[in-house]
Swiss-Prot record:
Keyword Nucleotide-binding: no
Similarity section: Belongs to the oxygen-dependent FAD-linked oxidoreductase family.
SUPFAM superfamilies given in the database record: FAD-binding/transporter-associated domain-like (SSF56176)
Protein name: FAD-linked oxidoreductase easE
Organism listed in the record: Claviceps fusiformis (Ergot fungus)
Residue positions with a glycan: N44, N73, N369
Lineage of the species this protein comes from: Eukaryota, Fungi, Dikarya, Ascomycota, Pezizomycotina
Length: 581
């Protein structure tokens, strides 16, 4: 009898594993809930043929998928940031295209030591399908489809992300790359209001920074945007807070300047969020993070005059072994920033290691509405004497730009070969820098960070208007209103999981393994409020973003809820193995 019970128990257990409920997980390709070919075809037809089945971009360089001409094209284009931004098969930070191991990867042909023709291309974290939406009705159709089939939904804007939020295994992607509307308003009146808020621009979800900058050049305006030209203007940059390294000091954060959102919610409704309508959603989208509360189809943002600016640059250089580079040089540059901030002049400090034997730090100051080059030179030189006393090599350059937009980059970046990045950042409070030894303390701490030859460390100047806008209620951590700088370290890495960094405060440049993300990014009170708004607008958590509001309820990839039982987890593993085989 016992001999019989063994096989019967195994059969019963196997039957249970096969048919165990998967309601706590998103549907995956090996499960019966996965959309049929007919389902995908119907969605494609409703979108005028803009649904595509995708493979990693380098698949044409591997195994049976190899195509010589297509592979050569990938090798040529793979370093182009603009190409990566518009391509649903790629991300900017390449490390997030792969899985946890090299066996879950699909590298391009230029990667050294990798045998492409004889190796298979693995999907990794690249979604299985991408919908290239062209209208709000397309977005609504995709949201309904994802809801109906319980799919893991991801949104790809430009793919700039330090935690891989634009992709996930076995997922369905909505790409914003065709939503390029740009409309300029002389005096924007938000819906539900009778009062104009001055000049503004409405941007579609797929507009990149360089595109709105170029439009601004033609129409004599600028916006509060980031420095990287291929970052999306409406996506996670804006919804995550939006920091400009130079302009935030005089114009605030991006979320301080957004006037209205148009949002497709998780039940596929199209709603407006501003100070008059759906105020809770408006608050959440002003710092609560992208891809979390709904699909932002467009946003309207305040614009500023394209005024002249005089840019003054001071560069110091020293040998790596010269400790005075940090203790005196960098410390003095921080003092200079503080001095000019007190005169309402913003600045950014950038530290690099141009060679293995040398260090370099550059301070760039922006004198707005100033064209008197001689005056700026005198102001700068009057503050540089301490650097010369310490025999630190110093050079300066002052140049006048007729328009502030001349300083904005309107060309996509070209990355170095085999280049991937991780980033970490931390806020430095104004109170810390104003202490007697505050600048020395910060310089000393920065000197302890290992800076490689392809790494870059830079400050984003806060304070100023960011502090003055304290009355504006946003969902970012309250510490932003008290900070003097955001300090960011960007490190070059190979595309592997193991080299990812830690310890940050800005979600847009955050640690993908941050355990205390709720407190670090938003603070206890703000997070509780955000969680309640998330529960109202997205009760089934369709919009799930890594280290985003509500993500603590899910596994790392947003596939299964953490409350999934042992039996259900084992069932999922067995199904996956059968699907692979």
């Amino acid at each position: 009898m016992y001999r019989l019970l063994g096989p019967l128990a195994c059969l019963a257990l196997a039957w249970f594993f096969t048919w165990a409920p998967s309601g706590r997980c998103r549907c995956r390709p090996w499960e019966t809930c996965w959309p049929s070919v007919a389902d995908w075809s119907a969605l494609n037809e409703s979108m005028q043929g803009n649904l595509i089945r995708i493979r990693p971009v380098a698949s044409v360089c591997h195994g049976s998928e190899y195509e010589a001409a297509a592979c050569a094209n990938v090798s040529n284009m793979v370093v182009d940031s603009g190409w990566r931004a518009s391509n649903p098969r790629t991300l900017q930070d390449w490390i997030w295209e792969t899985g946890n191991t090299a066996q879950e990867s699909c590298f391009d042909t230029t990667w050294p030591g990798y045998h492409h023709r004889t190796s298979d291309c693995h999907q990794g974290r690249i979604p299985l399908y991408s919908a290239i939406v062209e209208s709000t009705s397309d977005i609504q159709s995709c949201v309904k489809f994802a809801n109906h089939h319980n799919l893991r939904l991801v949104i790809k804007n430009s793919g700039h992300d330090t935690a891989g939020r634009s992709s996930a295994p076995h997922s369905f992607q909505i790409s914003t790359s065709s939503l390029k509307t740009i409309s300029l308003h002389e005096n924007f009146v938000p819906r539900g209001s009778t009062t104009g808020h001055g000049p503004a621009v409405t941007l579609g979800a797929g507009v990149m920074q360089w595109e709105v900058y170029a439009h601004g050049v033609k129409n004599a305006y600028t916006i509060l945007g980031g420095e990287c030209p291929t970052v999306g203007a409406v996506g996670a940059f804006l919804q995550g807070g939006g920091v400009s390294s130079i302009k935030s000091f005089t114009k605030g954060l991006a979320v301080d300047n957004v006037l209205e959102f148009q949002v497709v919610t998780s039940n596929a409704d199209l709603v407006t969020a501003n100070e008059n309508e759906n105020q809770d959603l408006f608050w959440a989208l002003r710092g609560g993070g992208g891809g979390t509360f709904g699909f932002v189809a467009q946003a309207t943002i305040r614009v500023f005059p394209d005024d002249p600016v005089t840019v003054a640059t001071t560069t110091i250089k020293a040998a790596v072994t010269n400790t005075m580079f940090w203790t005196e040089g960098v410390r003095e540059l921080f003092r200079l920033v503080q001095h000019f901030n007190d005169m309402h002049i913003p600045g950014q400090l950038v530290m690099t290691r141009p060679t293995t034997d040398s260090m370099q730090a550059t301070l760039e100051l922006h004198f707005a509405n100033t064209t008197d080059e001689a005056h700026v030179t005198r102001l700068l030189n009057s503050q540089l004497r301490p650097l010369t006393l310490h025999h630190i090599s110093t050079s300066t350059l002052v140049r006048v730009q007729e328009r502030e937009s001349s300083e904005l980059r309107t060309k996509p970046d070209i990355y170095p070969p085999h280049y991937g990045i991780v980033a970490g950042s931390v806020l430095i409070s104004a109170a810390t820098l104003r202490k007697a030894q505050g600048q020395s303390h910060v310089a000393s701490k920065l000197s302890q960070l290992p800076l490689g030859s392809n790494d870059i460390m830079f400050t984003s100047n806060l304070g100023g208007r960011v502090f003055e806008n304290s009355a504006i209620d946003i969902s970012l951590h309250p510490a932003w209103r008290e900070a003097a700088h955001l300090i960011t370290l960007v490190r070059a890495v190979e595309p592997t999981i193991e080299d990812r960094d830690s310890q940050v405060s800005y979600r847009n440049l955050g640690d993908p393994q941050e355990k205390e993300f709720r407190d670090r990014y938003w603070g206890t009170a703000n997070y509780a409020r955000l969680a309640a708004i998330k529960a109202k607008w997205d009760p089934h958590e369709l919009f799930m973003s890594k280290l985003g509001v509500g993500s603590e309820n899910w596994d790392e990839e947003g596939i299964c809820r953490k409350s999934l039982g042992f039996v259900e987890r084992l069932s999922a593993i067995l199904k996956l193995e059968r699907w692979k085989n």
